[in-house]
Amino acid sequence: MPGDQEPHGKARWRAWARERRDGLAIDHAAVVAGLRDFLGAVDGAAGGWILTYRPLPGEVDLDALLPDWRCAVTRTHAGGLLTVHPADASTERHRLGYLQPVAGTPEVARADVTVALVPGLAFDPWGTRLGHGAGHYDRLLPGLGPRVPRVGVTSGALVTAVRLPIEPHDTPMTHLATEAGVRAIRS
């Protein structure tokens, strides 16, 4: 693993994560099963919106959760802004290949999101998320409020043993979901 903890070291960590996940066999069903158990225990999850995502290649596919919960997904606008919309809305393919709600779909108020399921290239045991570098989730997550559980979703093979570089705009996760289940972040 790269050892550089400086913010510029994120590029090395991204390269490490992309190489590591190439050909990685993720047990999507195990991750989803752990998330079902977790969501069933979260106060307000059944009545609120669960923010999930439509996966990029190499990310855990959470579409199996969609029928069981009131789920929302993001739409990425040209300037990089993420908005939140019902997951059952009509979709179009984003230029990066994932499905997203079509333009004009009604938005879900961020205040109505009760749990956020967040993808990433890698995570560390302290909740630091390493994204793709565009800052989309860095801008979205703070607007959800401090009490919303933020669950980093990944393969256990992409959870580092050491701290990832972190910058002031990075929003830490409160939980990690892997094939081994969902666990609270250690402090």
Which residues fall in each region the model found?
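Surface-exposed, charge/polar-rich loops and edge strands
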Residues: 1-13, 19-23, 102-107, 111-116, ...
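Flexible loop residues that form catalytic
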Residues: 55, 121, 181
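N-terminal start-of-chain detector that recognizes signal peptides
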Residues: 44-45, 88-91, 122-123, 146-151
